[in-house]
Amino acid sequence: MSAVRENGVIVAIDGPSGAGKSSLTKLLAKRLGYIHIDTGAMFRAVALSAQRAGIKSDDDAGLAELCRGLEIAFARDGETCRVLANGEDVSTKIRTEEIGLLTSTISARKPVRQALLEMQRKMGAKGGVILEGRDIGTVVFPDAEVKFFLSASAEERGRRRYLELAARGESATLEETIAKVIQRDRQDEGREHAPLKQAQDAVPIDSTSLTIEQVLELMESTVKERLAQGDKG
């Protein structure tokens, strides 16, 4: 087994909406001392910027120009990580249901995927990073040393999302939230460019009946095992 990269390994966590990727990535990054790159937040930042600029989701030329002038960064703020779009903190603004659905459409556009692909590869090239999204292990970093595919039933993912929305004071019914999760799955799995699918060498984890701590321990032990193999290589 070859040695790991300059700063460690690249960990790719893929899976559908609501599978718990963001929460687990943050916790795993903290335990390993790695940098968390939230690729979903990057696409959401593009969607928010496009909405503000009045750029339609099928306007490839407009989206390409938007991405050229958009700088996305992550800033650690204590236990949380803020998402910045051209210096503005958009961490909360990008998490609405409206932006979530728009993101699924815009993220399927080739100019957007290409622009963010380049950003993500630059951010993670030296290792010591955890990236989560829908095509990290298949497209962004197919050579990532550790890959996970995190899933859960649509009902469980909808329930988790419903609780998140309720905690933020957003009005939605459980049935509506589950329906939107299923709709998002169809969009993500059916898009032309980089559809959601499990990498052949990814470790599959169904978190439907597992606690966050159980999933976290499984992920941490897998990464540490890979690091140990690299040290011997």
UniProtKB/Swiss-Prot annotation:
Location, primary (coarse class)? cytoplasm
List residues binding ATP: G15, P16, S17, G18, A19, G20, K21, S22, S23
The places in or outside the cell where this protein is found are: Cytoplasm
- Keyword Transferase assigned: yes
- Gene3D superfamilies membership: P-loop containing nucleotide triphosphate hydrolases
| GO BP term, example | nucleobase-containing small molecule interconversion
Source domain of life is Bacteria
Stored Pfam families: Cytidylate_kin (PF02224)
Q: Which reaction does it catalyse?
A: CMP + ATP = CDP + ADP; dCMP + ATP = dCDP + ADP
UniProt GO MF annotations:
ATP binding; CMP kinase activity; dCMP kinase activity
State the UniProt keywords alphabetically.
ATP-binding, Cytoplasm, Kinase, Nucleotide-binding, Transferase
Carries keyword rRNA-binding?
no
One GO cellular component assignment for this chain's record is: cytosol
Q: What is its EC number?
A: 2.7.4.25
InterPro entries cross-referenced by the UniProt entry: Cytidylate_kin, Cytidylate_kinase_dom, P-loop_NTPase
Similarity field? Belongs to the cytidylate kinase family. Type 1 subfamily.
What name does the UniProt record give this protein?
Answer: Cytidylate kinase
